[in-house]
A protein has these predicted regions:
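Bacterial lipoprotein signal-peptidase II cleavage site
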Residues: 42-48
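Secretory/export targeting leaders with adjacent low-complexity proregions
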Residues: 55-327, 331-338, 488
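N-terminal secretory signal peptides that target proteins for export/translocation
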Residues: 1-18
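C-terminal motif of bacterial Sec signal peptides marking the signal peptidase cleavage site
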Residues: 37-40
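Small-residue packing motifs within transmembrane alpha-helices
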Residues: 17, 22-30
């Protein structure tokens, strides 16, 4: 369950190619990731934001438009850029489509306007299985593209302008120092999921708090909840500042280093469902910081200079996030309840985009120095987030720790993205495993879902998939720092 911190989407292979010998994995916790631009670095390409990327789709509509054959994008560059991370991510989606959670999410009760794009679970599952087979078995890029053009409908995001233009950001999982007990240094807790938090049994969306008389009532705001002392006794783990607590809440997951150097993993376990207001946005809109300062390093330095000022803007966010302990194998998990893969998993608004499908991005991504590079790559829609709530937004998962944070902090570019949906007449060509088919025997109704995911959206129950270790990120040079990402 991941939150909102930004990173770029080069695969490890392409990253190494783009920065041969120059990048070294950044070490240390998020707290140590304060970075600045050096004088010799190129200025990142400016993004023109004449249209609000968070413009909302009208109720009852999805976020895609079906392309005519003449509008289909070229697939050659993305086909050639496939790597082991994409292979891992598409395998995870294929496995997810064999679970009861996927059938619940693609049930007629849950799909809403997405049913206008994908008829149901079996078509969505077949889309992933077919794409995986074609990517693996096609003799070359032309053969692959010809097959996809024939067998798939391609849908493009409506974007922020109705024509596909979108803001492409990124996020990652922070690494912080923490303690299992309160100390003079560690005195700011993350909280466990309260017993009286009520969520939808299928979607995991919060419904409210169970009152003593059995009724369901709204939760108070985050500020009111903390001031009321209602959560006393449900502390899970302790951090060194209120700002780091907020960073964890926004991201929904973290790798925590204990005083004895052992490692704990925390992940999203629920939220109150109150309105989410991003800290970076609040500070910028109020004129406290500039657009360029809307990154984690700058906001952290501001907090260190004037914690009371930053706390005022933290308090504008009414939503409260709760946490649970995770093992390293299942962490970090996205809104599908399965592990996300750095440089291959994407977060989108699941109310208007379909879960688990193959996507293709046409955008620019930033390197460690903030330079923009053309980027065309297949990825998997496997997550969502509190700040990613529009057709004009997508967030690429960049991994864990300071190296990912640097890339995330630099990723802020216009672009577009596409979804691939297998045409119904080709479904028989790609038979699903029995366990992946929608039948009365394998539809599980009413199974409690995991609470909404880290970033604030609903996370279904985990599918118990083992995360295969991904290749390490190429490391950024110590002499080429860049802003770390900001909570959006």
């Amino acid at each position: 369950m991941l939150g909102r911190i930004t990173t770029h989407a080069l695969s490890a292979r392409r990253l190494r190619r783009a920065h041969t010998g120059a990048m070294l994995v950044a070490v240390g916790a998020l707290a140590a990731a304060s970075t600045i631009f050096l004088g010799g670095c190129e200025t990142p390409e400016k993004v023109t934001r004449e249209v609000d990327p968070d413009v909302q789709i009208p109720p009852g509509e999805h976020g895609l438009r079906k392309l005519s054959r003449e509008e289909y994008p070229d697939l050659a560059a993305a086909y050639k850029a496939r790597d082991d991370k994409f292979a891992k991510a598409i395998d995870i989606s294929a496995q997810w489509f064999m679970t009861g959670t996927s059938r619940q999410n693609y049930s007629s009760e849950q799909m809403g306007p997405i049913s206008q794009v994908v008829a149901g679970h079996d078509q969505a599952a077949a889309s992933v299985y077919a794409f995986r087979e074609l990517a693996a078995k096609s003799s070359d890029a032309k053969a692959f593209q010809d097959a996809v053009y024939e067998q798939f409908d391609i849908w493009q995001t409506r974007g922020k302008d109705g024509k596909g233009k979108s803001l492409i950001t990124g996020y990652c999982s922070p690494e912080l120092k923490a303690s299992m007990t309160a100390t003079e240094i560690f005195k700011y807790p993350l909280y466990r999921r309260p017993a009286d938090l009520v969520t939808d049994s299928v979607t995991g969306e919060p419904l409210g708090r169970r009152a003593a008389d059995g009724s369901i009532v709204p939760w108070p705001s985050r500020k009111e909840l903390l001031a009321s002392n209602q959560l006393a006794g449900s502390e899970l783990i302790w951090l060194s500042s209120a700002f780091e607590v907020y960073v964890c809440e926004v991201n929904g997951s973290a790798k925590l280093i204990m005083p004895d150097n052992t490692v704990k993993y925390v992940g999203y376990a629920g939220k109150t469902g109150r309105p989410y207001i991003g800290l970076g946005v609040s500070l910028k809109d109020s004129g406290v910081i500039t657009t360029r300062e809307r990154n984690l390093s700058s906001i952290r330095r501001l907090y260190e200079r004037d914690s009371a000022l930053v706390q005022q803007y933290i308090d504008k966010n009414e939503n409260m996030v709760f946490f649970g302990m995770y093992d390293g194998k299942s962490w970090p998990a996205g809104s599908l309840g399965v592990p996300v893969t750095d440089h291959a998993s994407v977060a989108t608004d699941k109310k208007i985009f379909p879960r688990g499908l193959v996507m293709m991005f046409d955008t620019k991504v930033a390197d460690y120095a903030g330079r923009q590079n053309q980027f065309n790559q297949f990825m998997m829609d496997q997550d969502t987030g509190g700040a990613i709530r529009a057709a004009g937004r997508a967030d690429i998962y960049m991994g864990v720790g300071a190296a990912a944070e640097i890339l995330a902090g630099n990723q802020f570019a216009d672009g577009t993205f596409y979804y691939f949906v297998l045409k119904p007449e080709f479904m028989a060509k790609y038979p699903l495993p029995t366990s992946a088919k929608t039948t009365p025997a394998n539809i599980v109704r009413g199974t409690p879902a995991a609470a909404p995911n880290a970033k604030g959206a609903s996370a279904p129950a985990a599918a118990n998939l083992t995360q295969v270790p991904a290749p390490p990120l190429a490391q950024p040079p110590a002499s080429t720092p860049a802003p770390a990402p900001a909570p959006k």
